[in-house]
Amino acid sequence: MKNKFYLHEFQIFDGEAWITFNIVDLNELKNEISVAITNRGKITVVTYDLYKDENGYYFEYGCEYTKININDFKEIK
């Protein structure tokens, strides 16, 4: 699954701007995901805990713990 999602992209609107996530690393053994986050022109790479529910794998983003589902990421060509 690691290479399947490499650099796949997802965008979310936070009420003011679009935030873009790109998967850099997905480690099921450690239950971690590293994503490059582009937020208002600033790019950061952050590692989050990876969770699983009935809809698949996800991580929680921001102070409101927004659920970001891995299956929502799309390959950019």
Name the predicted role of every residue range.
Residues 1-4, 74-77:
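Short intrinsically disordered terminal tails
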Residues 4-15:
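Short aromatic-glycine-(Arg/Gly/Cys) micro-motifs in beta-strand/loop hairpins
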